[in-house]
């Protein structure tokens, strides 16, 4: 199988090997039939919805921290890590424009321009600079972020420099280079307390055990990006149709085994 689905050679394959022809054929066909019969049961391990709906659910929830996975731009899966779509949606909402709105941590977004200014002005200063959309600007352009610098940390192996900028009720973690935030210490090192925060948005997919155990609730947002998980939304260029789930009512494919000669014979 392959996740690089936009190619005529990509499809799901059941491969069985052995030295008994009848057993190999029957095993392959039986397993393929099981995959096909259960195709509609394959789901994410957490609920999924749009980024807009994710924010609405998080704002209304009394469980904290309500963690949202911004998974379409997950750098650990191959995303650029600097797509601004989700953060832009957050900053546009009136709920987060006031200091006493729902507390939110956004982790994280690269912004070398803002980092440079924050290092010069220091903690407690007002800073304004561009963040994000350096590598991937297909869905949203750079954000001109302004706010108060509440933390600066240098020397991180991945981010190099981390700066927290507070704007309204949102704490935005800005980095020199992209970094996934997997551990509580990633936040507390920046004087942020994720356990006592209403909403935490992370650019990862499935939650690592530490964040999973911390969550009050969790949803995976089908956000745009280089690793967009909304399969039906992707603009396929090279694909053999019909293919499930793009064609949900397609007829059963040919599940007969095809024999391949042993390579050294």
Question: Where do the model's predicted regions map?
Answer:
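Single conserved hydrophobic/aromatic residue that forms the stacking wall/gate
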Residues: 1-5, 9
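Metallocofactor- and cofactor-centric catalytic cores in central/energy metabolism, strongly enriched
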Residues: 11-13, 18-20, 32-66, 76
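Extended hydrophobic packing segments that form well-structured cores
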Residues: 14, 36-39, 157-265
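Short, glycine-/Ser/Thr-/acidic-enriched flexible segments
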Residues: 19-21, 72-75, 111-112, 170, ...
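Short, conserved charged micro-motifs
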Residues: 21-28
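Short, solvent-exposed amphipathic alpha-helical segments in soluble enzyme
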Residues: 29-33, 82-95, 122-123, 188-193, ...
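Generic beta-sheet signal
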Residues: 64-70, 200
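C-terminal catalytic subdomain
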Residues: 74-166
């Amino acid at each position: 199988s392959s996740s690089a689905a936009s190619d005529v050679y990509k499809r799901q394959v059941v491969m069985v090997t052995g030295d008994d022809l009848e057993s190999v054929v029957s095993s392959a066909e039986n397993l393929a039939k099981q995959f096909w019969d259960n195709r509609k049961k394959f789901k994410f391990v957490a609920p999924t919805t749009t980024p807009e709906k994710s924010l609405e659910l998080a704002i209304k929830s009394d469980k904290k921290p309500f963690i949202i996975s911004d998974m379409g731009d997950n750098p650990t899966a191959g995303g650029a890590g600097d797509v601004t779509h989700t953060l832009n949606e957050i900053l546009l909402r009136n709920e987060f424009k006031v200091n006493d709105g729902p507390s939110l941590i956004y982790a994280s977004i690269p912004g070398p321009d803002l980092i440079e200014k924050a290092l010069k002005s220091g903690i407690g200063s007002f800073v304004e600079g561009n963040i994000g959309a350096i590598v991937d600007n297909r869905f949203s352009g750079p954000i001109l972020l302004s706010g108060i610098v509440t933390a600066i940390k240098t020397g991180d192996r991945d981010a190099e420099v981390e700066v927290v900028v507070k704007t309204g009720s949102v704490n935005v973690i800005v980095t020199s280079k992209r970094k996934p935030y997997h551990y509580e210490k990633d936040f507390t090192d920046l004087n942020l307390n994720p356990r006592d925060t209403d909403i935490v948005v992370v650019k990862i997919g499935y939650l690592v055990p530490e964040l999973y155990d911390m969550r009050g609730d969790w949803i995976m947002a089908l956000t745009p990006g280089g690793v967009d998980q909304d399969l039906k939304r992707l603009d396929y260029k090279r694909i053999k149709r019909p293919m499930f789930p793009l064609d949900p009512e397609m007829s059963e494919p040919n599940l007969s085994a095809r024999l391949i000669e042993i390579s050294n014979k």
